[in-house]
């Protein structure tokens, strides 16, 4: 059982991975709950009884770094470089890139003010950031984190809308694959919304496999 409580200026968010965990944490005014569980009909029924709404289904993603035969260097069409996570452009891009992502929209109905506070917290905690640059402008970023002993995880990534079709996202993800291989990782992992077909297609292009579905439920008080 995991209960993570995060306090923001205007509200408190509890992230829970067990449907029984909430009972040990009394509700307060301005408290939002986000529960993520393995996809199963019983879990869905139980959470609905508790007053939660189904918000999203996420999928685990993995790119094997030992089996792939793709030439990822040929997929990189933009300049990719390390960047200070505190660069203001990173926060700006993040704030404009997730209009409905349930990692950040923790209210049953999307709320830009609330999601903005959650996004700011996420960006503040980024550690190993790479940016995509076009004519001196940062047009996208990707944060790469250790994942277990042998893998890496794409913790957060976003690209300015007008550069997505131009290959900026592919360049960032291909660079992440090469970076993970240089670190000696066996797999590059991620977790995405099953409704995000653009990112799903991007991962598929890079040879990823999908599995481990998890359902996201939210409730507010």
Q: Where does each model-flagged region fall?
A:
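Conserved acetyl-CoA binding element of GNAT-fold acetyltransferases
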Residues: 7-19, 150-161
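Catalytic cores of nucleotide-enabled group-transfer and carboxylate-activating enzymes in metabolic
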Residues: 124, 130-132, 174, 181, ...
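Conserved GNAT acetyl-CoA-binding A-motif
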Residues: 29-39, 180-192
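Short amphipathic alpha-helix that is part of the acyltransferase structural core
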Residues: 3, 11-15, 74-113
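Conserved active-site alpha-helix within GNAT-family acetyltransferase domains
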Residues: 40-54, 170, 194-212
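A conserved beta-strand-loop-helix scaffold within acyl/acetyltransferase catalytic domains
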Residues: 102-135, 139-152, 156-159
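Acyl-donor-binding surface of acyltransferase catalytic domains
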Residues: 17-85, 217-219
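Conserved acetyl-CoA-binding loop-helix of GNAT-fold acetyltransferases
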Residues: 20-26, 156-159, 165-178, 182, ...
């Amino acid at each position: 059982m995991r209960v993570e409580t995060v306090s923001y200026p205007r509200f408190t968010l509890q992230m829970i991975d067990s449907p029984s965990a909430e009972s040990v944490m009394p509700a307060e005014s301005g408290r939002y709950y986000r529960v993520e569980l393995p996809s199963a009909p019983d879990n869905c029924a139980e959470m609905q009884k508790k007053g939660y709404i189904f918000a999203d289904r996420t999928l685990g993603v993995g790119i094997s770094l030992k089996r792939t035969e793709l030439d990822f260097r040929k997929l990189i069409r933009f300049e990719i470089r390390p960047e200070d996570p505190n660069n203001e452009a990173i926060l700006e891009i993040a704030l404009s890139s997730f209009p409905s992502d349930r990692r950040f929209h923790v209210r049953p109905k999307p709320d830009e003010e609330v999601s903005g506070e959650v996004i700011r917290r996420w960006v503040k905690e980024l550690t190993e950031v790479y940016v995509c640059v076009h004519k001196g402008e940062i047009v996208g970023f990707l944060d790469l984190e250790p994942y277990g002993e042998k893998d890496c995880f794409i913790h957060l990534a976003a690209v300015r809308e007008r550069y997505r079709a131009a290959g900026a996202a592919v360049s960032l993800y291909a660079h992440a694959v090469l970076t993970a291989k240089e670190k000696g990782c066996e797999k590059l992992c991620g977790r995405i919304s099953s409704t995000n077909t653009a990112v799903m297609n991007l991962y598929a292009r890079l040879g990823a496999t999908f599995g481990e579905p998890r359902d996201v439920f939210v409730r507010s008080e």
